[in-house]
């Protein structure tokens, strides 16, 4: 009798061990950690910026799987400028500084990446590659510019696409055999790109360069564009260009931040120095949550520091909070 009981106990223990092993293997296959994505606004490397101060930002990006920024400049030694009011460029070492902080994804879908023509733009692509910073919103031709990037992070596929509604003009737009950015005014191509990215991604992030400079409120056509893009599969939309922080909304697991304003950029006005880091968390079951960590750009270093000012800047209360 005792031997039978012993055999039964061994069998039960064996089954328990097997079940435990299967459970462990199953848990390993299922992602348990949230994906963390930090997104900021405009970054350029003009001489007024104290680069040594940028290192202080590192701790705010340590948790990020993807740390995304709008590279509002060409990275080039090219001297031939496009004819426009402002032309921005920086050296390749600036990218190394950004990389050391944790930035690993740049959108180049804007009106300054082509400031030094096609050669300056191509230099920018090469320098980003050398720095180990991925990019979206542009490429050596239109196929690459519109295909976006898909990042495999903690068991989820995160698709990212940059869309230049405000761009550097007709010459800056990518073509079949020409380098350049996407063109947000080409609705059909943009919508096809979103649809294609949706098919290969668990989460789609869209980064439009749009909006009216200096405004705290999105315009009607930006709101309607966002709704259309969401209907095509965009889960997260984070804009830039206005040089101001605009409102953030999360409804029915769709997140939109109309503009993240400036980040590493110079301006004397408080409303243009008010900024933040949009810290997005995506759960294993694809639930989206966010926190806006408020900063203000220091007037001396042109690099942001923690501040509660940003939390009060919304479309609804801009009249009473704007400092002029």
Predicted regions and their residues:
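Sec-dependent signal peptide recognition
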Residues: 2-8
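C-terminal motif of bacterial Sec signal peptides marking the signal peptidase cleavage site
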Residues: 16-17
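Residue-level signal for mature regions of secreted extracellular proteins and peptides
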Residues: 11-12
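Acidic, metal/ion-coordinating pockets
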Residues: 20-324
């Amino acid at each position: 009798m005792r031997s039978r009981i012993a055999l039964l106990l061994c069998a039960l223990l064996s089954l328990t061990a097997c079940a435990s092993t299967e459970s462990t293997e199953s848990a390993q296959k299922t992602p348990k950690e949230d994906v963390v994505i930090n997104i900021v606004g405009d970054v350029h490397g003009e001489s007024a910026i104290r680069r040594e101060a940028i290192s202080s930002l590192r701790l705010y990006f340590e948790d990020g799987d993807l740390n995304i920024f709008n590279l509002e400049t060409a990275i080039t030694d090219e001297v031939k400028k496009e004819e426009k009011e402002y032309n921005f460029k920086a050296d390749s070492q600036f990218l190394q500084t950004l990389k050391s902080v944790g930035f690993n994804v740049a959108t180049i879908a804007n009106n300054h990446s082509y400031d030094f023509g096609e050669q300056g733009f191509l230099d920018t692509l090469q320098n980003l590659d050398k720095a180990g910073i991925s990019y979206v919103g542009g490429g050596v031709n239109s196929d690459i510019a519109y295909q976006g990037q898909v990042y495999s992070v903690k068991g989820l596929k995160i698709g990212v696409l940059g869309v230049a509604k405000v761009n550097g003009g007709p010459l800056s737009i990518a073509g079949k055999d020409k380098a350049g950015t996407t063109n947000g005014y080409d609705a059909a191509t943009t919508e096809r790109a979103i649809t294609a990215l949706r098919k290969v991604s668990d989460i789609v992030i869209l980064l439009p360069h749009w909006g009216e400079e200096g405004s705290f409120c999105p315009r009607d056509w930006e709101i309607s564009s966002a709704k259309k893009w969401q209907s095509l599969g965009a889960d997260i939309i984070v804009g830039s260009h206005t040089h101001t922080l605009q409102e953030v909304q999360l409804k029915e697991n769709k997140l939109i931040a109309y503009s993240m304003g400036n980040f590493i950029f110079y301006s004397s006005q408080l409303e243009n120095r008010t900024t933040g880091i949009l810290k997005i968390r995506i759960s294993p079951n694809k639930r989206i949550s966010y926190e806006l960590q408020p900063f203000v750009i220091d007037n001396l270093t042109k690099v942001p520091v923690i501040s509660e000012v940003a939390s009060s800047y919304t479309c609804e209360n801009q009249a009473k909070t704007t400092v002029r």
